[in-house]
Amino acid sequence: MEFSPPLQRATLIQRYKRFLADVITPDGRELTLHCPNTGAMTGCATPGDTVWYSTSDNTKRKYPHTWELTQSQSGAFICVNTLWANRLTKEAILNESISELSGYSSLKSEVKYGAEHSRIDFMLQADSRPDCYIEVKSVTLAENEQGYFPDAVTERGQKHLRELMSVAAEGQRAVIFFAVLHSAITRFSPARHIDEKYAQLLSEAQQRGVEILAYKAELSAEGMALKKSLPVTL
């Protein structure tokens, strides 16, 4: 996926009110960007980081600029727009870049399912194969090349794991897919030090037949794509 039109560069002053960030452009203008990420954004929003942003042609938007990527002061690229995790995963599935998810003839998005009234990110179908339910999570928290999810306690994420276990128990295929959107990450684990319950549920889910996949995106200011499978340690 290529960014079109090209992203523009600025330097981060501060992120605040969760949804806003002030930046300064190379020519000295101060802008307020929309921040499409409600998470903690640990390590992704340090003042002085380079920010890459898009600009909407919708004249009715109060904040027409959207923060898409961070380029940290160590040089790592991080996709902070959480919407891209699903978009990149869908693109990779359709391009058959994810070998574990290839060979299906139909892809549906946001399908209602489960006893807890959830919506699955993607459902894959094919003749003579069980349906494949895929829940996507964006991974941007990094420490010494180790990627972690979540970056804050997530009751919603815990619910999704319970739903996937129910799907697997019914004989369908259930997949939790971690889209790693940080160029410095080389391996993945659940963030037990942040959400122990989620880590416990992820281990239980694997034991009950839920598949765990982690794929890393190649990231740059020009574009990004999920390319490489990463090792997962529970």
Curated annotation (Swiss-Prot):
What GO molecular functions are on record for this protein? Answer: DNA binding
Provide this UniProt record's keywords sorted from A to Z.
DNA-binding
Matching Gene3D superfamilies: 2.40.50.580, 3.40.1350.60
Q: Does the keyword Cytoplasm apply?
A: no
Which sections of the sequence are annotated for DNA binding?
201-220
Q: Which domain of life is it from?
A: Bacteria
Keyword hit for DNA-binding: yes
User: Which InterPro entries does the UniProt entry name for this protein?
Assistant: SfsA, SfsA_C, SfsA_N
Q: Which CDD domains match?
A: SfsA-like_bacterial
Q: Which family does it belong to?
A: Belongs to the SfsA family.
Known function: Binds to DNA non-specifically. Could be a regulatory factor involved in maltose metabolism.
Record's protein name = Sugar fermentation stimulation protein A
Which organism was this protein described from? Escherichia coli O7:K1 (strain IAI39 / ExPEC)
The taxonomic lineage of its organism, from the top, reads: Bacteria, Pseudomonadati, Pseudomonadota, Gammaproteobacteria, Enterobacterales
| Encoding gene per record | sfsA
